[in-house]
Amino acid sequence: MAALRRFLWPPPRLSPALAPQQPFLSPWGRPAGTAPGMSGRPFSCREEDEGAVAEAAWRRRRWGELSIAAAAGGGLVGLVCYQLYGDPRADPSELAAPELEDPPRGRGLLPIPVAAAKETVATGRAITEDLDLYATSRERRFRLFASIECEGQLFMTPYDFILAVTTDEPKFAKTWKSLSKQELSQMLSETPPVWKGSSKLFRNLKERGVISYTEYLFLLCILTKPHAGFRIAFNMFDTDGNEMVDKKEFLVLQEIFRKKNEKRETKGDEEKRAMLRLQLYGYHSPTNSVLKTDAGELVSRSYWDTLRRSTSQALFSDLAERADDITSLVADTTLLVHFFGKKGKAELNFEDFYRFMDNLQTEVLEIEFLSYSNGMNTISEEDFAHILLRYTNVENTSVFLENVRYSISEEKGITFDEFRSFFQFLNNLEDFAIALNMYNFASRSIGQDEFKRAVYVATGLKLSPHLVNTVFKIFDVDKDDQLSYKEFIGIMKDRLHRGFRGYKTVQKYPTFKSCLKKELHSR
């Protein structure tokens, strides 16, 4: 390093006045005779020989300094690269291994050896790929976002749930953090009671809570249903008709949701489905479903149909008899503690139930709105179009975005109240579709005034003129200032369900590999 400094910043030379006998140096530092104005005589032959020797010595010294400087510079560059990028020869899998061996917080476990961690991760990844082959789209999505595992069962945190309904996929590959029963109980002790609920419940809890798979299905149902249906849902929970819902009644209806979602098993996959049920429900549930007709065929109903139809009351008979067994098998979760207290003895009334459902819808909408508002009170009309088209199957969204960009000359913005009222309208989309179909049957498209009137008749909501005009500018592709069923209803049905109807995993290669492995094993 000293040689490098001497090369880059050479020490100052003495002036001619202080060194009259020194030969004058050229701009490159070589001897070039006596300096002008210096006293002395011209060089003799002997002096010329001495000058040649001095010049040769100078050259050797300069080359030595250059060599040392180059070596020092190369070493410095190598050190910087190593610090920034690490060892380029290292195996990437070995570099990633330490991240997978971190023990759960609060537990004094020894670090897992790297070799064992690599083997465990590879085995778990293969099992995950195999189980995805037998899972439904909702099961795959739950397992994709779940981040906690307790005694073999997977759970989402409140933060995981928010991500699952507001993003397409996790930003990073999730690893399941293992919790003991004691750690889970300690986490649930921070859950607030239902009367302290708010529209920021999930954001406040963040990762200090757990949501089971059946609760995930229940919460998805809440997000897409109108306020008028909340009473129907509560009455279906209230099996004894006392206007209160206890923990057993809540778990019985969750069991209905689970059985409705179970995928019909094919020959040869019993073991894989059993492993999948253990991950999703925490126990090996029986495969026979009460949601069957006399002919043994699965009833084709939505979750809301299960809640809405009075004939569904008969479905509780089989499950109500073994409600105690279900209660003993199901682990406590944030939702159960929030509704029924830490001891599970509290009961839930309709007002608290309604407030929870309304707060959940509001919280998810607030998160989506704030992600585009950048701290402002409004979002642009183009951002509103982005949100509406986000979970749809529309391939070329640029056409709709250009409609807004060029049709609305002056940007006024969409407020949160307008934003929320529109999504409340979407939750009533089925009733609105009936009214809109009546116009289509008459071979008519619908204008803005007719649209507002149909929305009010079907849902009781009054949409602002600016909001209605923005919707028409987005979906009026043929520029006739009219709206048809094809232009609007079909796209909005996809948006209402946030892509869950047609959700497909993006991991195409692992799925293909699992399918190929299954085919080879069957031969």
Curated annotation (Swiss-Prot):
Ca(2+) 1 binds at D238, D240, N242, M244, D246, E249. InterPro entries: EF-hand-dom_pair, EF_Hand_1_Ca_BS, EF_hand_dom, MICU1/2/3. SMART domains: EFh. GO terms for biological process: calcium import into the mitochondrion; cellular response to calcium ion; positive regulation of neurotransmitter secretion. Residues 226-261, 395-430, 464-499 form the EF-hand domain. Induction: Down-regulated in skeletal muscle from aged mice. It comes from the Eukaryota. Pfam families: EF-hand_7. It is found in: Mitochondrion intermembrane space; Mitochondrion inner membrane. The keyword 4Fe-4S does not apply. Disruption phenotype: Mice show impaired exercise capacity. Skeletal muscles display changes in the force response and fatigue, characterized by a significantly increased maximal force of the muscle and an altered fiber type composition with an increase in the ratio of type IIb (low oxidative capacity) to type IIa (high oxidative capacity) fibers. Belongs to the MICU1 family. MICU3 subfamily. Tissue-specific calcium sensor of the mitochondrial calcium uniporter (MCU) channel, which specifically regulates MCU channel activity in the central nervous system and skeletal muscle. Senses calcium level via its EF-hand domains: compared to MICU1 and MICU2, MICU3 has a higher affinity for calcium. MICU1 and MICU3 form a disulfide-linked heterodimer that stimulates and inhibits MCU activity, depending on the concentration of calcium. At low calcium levels, MICU1 occludes the pore of the MCU channel, preventing mitochondrial calcium uptake. This is Calcium uptake protein 3, mitochondrial.
